């Protein structure tokens, strides 16, 4: 059963025009009524219009209202989570731990729900063929880029991950046509990342992006755009906790997808690197 309707709406809501946002808010608040309604009925319930319903489905990248209803129905058939929750002043650690675990589960589940597996398969195929993958990201996304680099190196795949934008520009300037530039940016609007990505496109280098689920400046430049769910990180937004976990989840899916395609070779490399690391431990 198709899922991800609620996650897609939540991810895109902040970029919708007012008439469509009103409908989105109604569907999020009353999902059971939404799946039982026709276009005319849902527009009346939300004090909107039939045309706005059609525009909303188009903005969400869906085939139509029936597609949206099927995805929302799939969401409602799954076990429910508590959603994203923020901490409060002087909150005890057990409560913080519970909320953090819940937010992590929600971010990964929402991201899984809106995955485009055809695009993921394209990404895996391109990454397997690439000579070198240049992961680029700033701030918390830079940490994810570093994680991706170490995973690639462990299976004998050439990869870089630098947060110095001048150094990245130099790498792109000298990159080969069979390299890939993989940009990681939750907002998809970080100026330096957009400029570096545009530089890669001008050179004819294949580009893959990982951004929030939305049409962004970075995803618009990507040959293969990949997405995470738009998590509601309110007060503690600067920590980028849920979005970072969702990004790491996608990197893991790509890594394991590559490993599955070249299973014997990959396990051989992992065994070698594990042995090398273990040999350096104090006995």
UniProtKB/Swiss-Prot annotation:
Q: Which InterPro entries does UniProt cross-reference here?
A: Homeodomain-like_sf, HTH_RpiR, RpiR-like, RpiR-like_SIS, SIS_dom, SIS_dom_sf, WH-like_DNA-bd_sf
Q: Which keywords appear in this protein's UniProt record, sorted alphabetically?
A: DNA-binding, Transcription, Transcription regulation
Query: What is the species of this protein?
Result: Bacillus subtilis (strain 168)
Protein's name according to its UniProt entry: Uncharacterized HTH-type transcriptional regulator YbbH
Q: From its record, what is one biological process in GO terms?
A: regulation of DNA-templated transcription
Gene name of this polypeptide: ybbH
State the DNA-binding region(s).
39-58
Give the GO molecular function terms: carbohydrate derivative binding; DNA binding; DNA-binding transcription factor activity
State the Pfam families in the record: HTH_6, SIS
